[in-house]
Amino acid sequence: MPFGEYPYTIDDKGRVVIPPAFREFVEDGMILTRGMEGCLYVFPLASWRRVEEQLEGLPITDAGSRAFVRFFYSGANKARLDNQSRVSVPQTLRAFAQLDGDVIVAGAPGRLELWNPERWAAAIQAVQQDPPNPELLANFVA
């Protein structure tokens, strides 16, 4: 499972280096898509297959499910690392996540996340100021 956060930059062509700690995780290819809180999710292909199964299991008769699938699935793009361990982020996804210049590459369970540094700082600060529901953390052992 990837963990940690690494500051990188995205070049003028929309390429960002994947940190060495995460390269093996996505070496067989990846799917980039819109994430929550304005970031991008980067799933290795094996994880993406599980995500697809979950999306396919959502009821098409539910408007909220359809909207989420549309948001999440329509933004998906297949990618591979180039010879310099970079991934090319499509312009539509860069615009969605406001990626221009500095980028935070963060690990998360089953995926990586690409963040605008200001959005990343705000997301971290929000958790510090208003921790998640205590019931969600009841079994968390620190």
UniProtKB/Swiss-Prot annotation:
<keyword id="KW-0804">Transcription</keyword>
<dbReference type="InterPro" id="IPR007159">
    <property type="entry name" value="SpoVT-AbrB_dom"/>
</dbReference>
<keyword id="KW-0238">DNA-binding</keyword>
<dbReference type="InterPro" id="IPR038619">
    <property type="entry name" value="MraZ_sf"/>
</dbReference>
<feature type="domain" description="SpoVT-AbrB 2">
    <location>
        <begin position="76"/>
        <end position="119"/>
    </location>
</feature>
<feature type="domain" description="SpoVT-AbrB 1">
    <location>
        <begin position="5"/>
        <end position="47"/>
    </location>
</feature>
<protein>
    <recommendedName>
        <fullName>Transcriptional regulator MraZ</fullName>
    </recommendedName>
</protein>
<comment type="subunit">
    <text>Forms oligomers.</text>
</comment>
<dbReference type="GO" id="GO:0000976">
    <property type="term" value="F:transcription cis-regulatory region binding"/>
</dbReference>
<dbReference type="InterPro" id="IPR035644">
    <property type="entry name" value="MraZ_C"/>
</dbReference>
<keyword id="KW-0963">Cytoplasm</keyword>
<dbReference type="InterPro" id="IPR035642">
    <property type="entry name" value="MraZ_N"/>
</dbReference>
<comment type="similarity">
    <text>Belongs to the MraZ family.</text>
</comment>
<dbReference type="InterPro" id="IPR037914">
    <property type="entry name" value="SpoVT-AbrB_sf"/>
</dbReference>
<keyword id="KW-0805">Transcription regulation</keyword>
<dbReference type="GO" id="GO:0003700">
    <property type="term" value="F:DNA-binding transcription factor activity"/>
</dbReference>
<dbReference type="InterPro" id="IPR003444">
    <property type="entry name" value="MraZ"/>
</dbReference>
<dbReference type="GO" id="GO:0009295">
    <property type="term" value="C:nucleoid"/>
</dbReference>
<dbReference type="Pfam" id="PF02381">
    <property type="entry name" value="MraZ"/>
</dbReference>
<keyword id="KW-0677">Repeat</keyword>
<dbReference type="GO" id="GO:0005737">
    <property type="term" value="C:cytoplasm"/>
</dbReference>
<dbReference type="InterPro" id="IPR020603">
    <property type="entry name" value="MraZ_dom"/>
</dbReference>
<dbReference type="GO" id="GO:2000143">
    <property type="term" value="P:negative regulation of DNA-templated transcription initiation"/>
</dbReference>
